[in-house]
């Protein structure tokens, strides 16, 4: 088995690369994927988003080590174990990120990845329905749309934000991110539009693309060059040879794990694991970042929430309507309103994100109260806390050791306390007067800093946006793992391209930036000229230095 390019992982970036590397017919591509089929309602029905993440069949099911700042809780850290990777089990929320995110990447050493450089790739990948003209792509493979937003609670949330003095935005993925508006999702024709649907499945119809179901054990490195991948399938160890390059695209947990199993990583740690050190790169597995969030939940005085649809027999009606007609509530992830806000004067870009949901419910689908309600998923998205991914042993099948070190930076506590109080202010606006009942969570008795901190320690959870563990940077940065061309520093014929190479978190969900990374990396790999830099200037709040709104 051999191909010009061997891609480990069929996730957001891996699927995009498989398509772009093979589209001219000149190169052969093999995609290695351990996970199984994405066919079936649990993945394809948008409203069923809670199911695949709770199923071992689709999710690697990782847990963090006990988190000291969060009452030593082990935090769930899901990653997709299925065709399409995490794009097949995520919440389908589409956020490009803020322009300043990518400008920060370039400042951190990722030359050629500033906003002006990446915007053309976002446009190339998008098939936007109703986005801002001139800022959005309209003929790409990834369908992006807004929900119908028929529930009055969505509009109450947006109106409440305006009443509180915040901006509104018609398209947060266009020229103006800041403000309250309708949220976009990667769904189309009533179903999830994953990277597998957008990129991989069309690519697999080409004679030069092959998908191999297997477990990737390590990258084979000979004389300083990656020559293939050692895999296991059917109980046998085999080698898939790469005539040109091996591209690791296995997630922010498994990409550094694979590099370390291959002898690339912190030398002392590899020696402790009994692994021969091929390249001593201390940055492999370091720089782990993630978004955290909590649910702010309120009862509703009017029976307008989705609570009526939670009983099993009502869910059956939703499922049947989706199955036979691809219509109804099943066609949306129900995250149809949002906000991107700045936490304080002097903060230039939004750093607080809201997902609004017209029901009070946990991510696993359990109701928060036996009544109608609504909630906001609230997160401070520019945390300075950093963690690491390391090996548990030299056994390729052992789960990685994941230490996020959540809330280890004092600023995180200040920002999340502000998030609690800010949400109370928003939910307290006139737009919610007809709907607002008693507060469920955090609860009316949670008021002081100490009380809020106690709530946060017990209720903060991951937003499932890990990144940064194979950081992209300049070759003279000792903590960089890949250079701005996505090449692993010190090894020929080996690249990494997924969210693990992000130097820093983007402001928002990571599926969109991950796909963009695959799109752009493909041009680097093929040696193509980069798409022409954009000269469009995004909107920055003119009051940012003196006001938070």
Curated annotation (Swiss-Prot):
Q: What class of enzyme is it?
A: oxidoreductase
- Residues annotated as catalytic: 465 (proton acceptor)
Q: Which residues form a coiled coil?
A: none
Please indicate if the UniProt record lists Transmembrane helix as a keyword. no
Q: Which GO terms describe its biological process?
A: glycine betaine biosynthetic process from choline
Pathway assignment: Amine and polyamine biosynthesis; betaine biosynthesis via choline pathway; betaine aldehyde from choline (cytochrome c reductase route): step 1/1
Function, in words:
Involved in the biosynthesis of the osmoprotectant glycine betaine. Catalyzes the oxidation of choline to betaine aldehyde and betaine aldehyde to glycine betaine at the same rate.
Q: What is the official name of this protein in its record?
A: Oxygen-dependent choline dehydrogenase
Biological source species: Rhizobium rhizogenes (strain K84 / ATCC BAA-868)
By which gene is this protein encoded?
betA
């Amino acid at each position: 088995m051999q191909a010009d390019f061997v891609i480990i992982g069929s996730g957001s970036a891996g699927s995009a690369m498989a398509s772009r590397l093979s589209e001219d017919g000149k190169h052969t591509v093999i995609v290695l994927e351990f996970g199984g089929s994405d066919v079936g309602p649990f993945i394809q029905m948008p409203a069923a988003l809670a199911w695949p993440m709770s199923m071992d069949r689709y999710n690697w099911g990782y847990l963090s080590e006990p988190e000291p700042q969060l009452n030593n809780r082990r935090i769930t850290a899901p990653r997709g174990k299925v065709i399409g990777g995490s794009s097949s089990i995520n919440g389908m929320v589409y956020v490009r990120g803020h322009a300043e995110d990518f400008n920060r990447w370039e400042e951190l050493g990722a030359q050629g990845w500033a906003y002006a450089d990446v915007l053309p790739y976002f446009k190339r990948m998008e098939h936007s329905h109703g986005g801002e003209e001139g800022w959005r792509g309209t003929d790409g493979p990834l369908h992006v749309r807004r929900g119908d937003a028929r529930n009055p609670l969505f509009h109450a949330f947006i109106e409440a934000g305006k009443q509180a003095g915040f901006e509104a935005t018609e398209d947060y993925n266009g020229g103006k991110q800041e403000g309250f508006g309708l949220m976009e999702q990667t769904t189309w024709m009533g179903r999830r539009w994953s990277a597998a649907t957008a990129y991989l499945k069309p690519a697999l119809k080409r004679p030069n693309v092959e998908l191999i179901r297997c477990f990737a054990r390590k990258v084979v490195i000979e004389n300083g060059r990656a020559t293939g991948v050692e895999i296991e399938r059917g109980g046998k160890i085999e080698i898939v040879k790469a005539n040109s390059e091996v591209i690791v695209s296995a997630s922010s947990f498994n990409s550094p794990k694979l590099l370390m199993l291959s002898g690339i990583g912190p030398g002392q740690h590899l020696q402790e694991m009994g692994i021969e050190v091929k390249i001593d790169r201390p940055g492999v597995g370091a720089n782990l970042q993630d978004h955290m969030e909590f649910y702010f939940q309120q009862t509703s005085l009017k029976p307008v929430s989705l609570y009526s649809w939670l009983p099993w027999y009502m869910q059956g009606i939703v499922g049947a309507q989706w199955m036979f007609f691809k219509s109804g509530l099943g066609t949306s992830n129900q995250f149809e309103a949002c906000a991107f806000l700045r936490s304080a004067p002097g903060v230039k870009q939004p750093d607080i994100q809201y997902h609004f949901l017209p029901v009070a419910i946990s991510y696993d689908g359990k109701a928060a109260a036996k009544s109608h309600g609504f909630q906001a998923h609230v997160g401070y998205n520019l945390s300075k806390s950093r963690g690491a991914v390391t090996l548990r042993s030299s056994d390729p099948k052992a789960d990685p050791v994941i230490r996020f070190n959540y809330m280890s930076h004092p600023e995180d506590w200040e920002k999340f306390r502000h998030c609690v109080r800010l949400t109370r202010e928003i939910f307290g606006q006139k737009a919610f007067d007809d709907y607002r009942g008693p507060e469920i969570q955090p609860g009316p008795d949670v008021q002081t800093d100490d009380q809020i901190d106690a709530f946060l320690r017990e209720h903060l959870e991951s937003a499932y946006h890990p990144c940064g563990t194979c950081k992209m940077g300049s070759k003279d940065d000792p903590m960089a793992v890949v250079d701005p061309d996505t090449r692993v520093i010190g090894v020929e014929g080996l690249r990494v391209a997924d969210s693990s190479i992000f130097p820093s978190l983007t402001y928002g969900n990571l599926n969109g930036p991950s796909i963009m990374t695959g799109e752009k990396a493909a041009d680097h790999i093929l040696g193509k000229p980069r798409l022409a830099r954009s000269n469009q200037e995004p909107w920055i709040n003119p009051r940012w230095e003196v006001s938070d709104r």
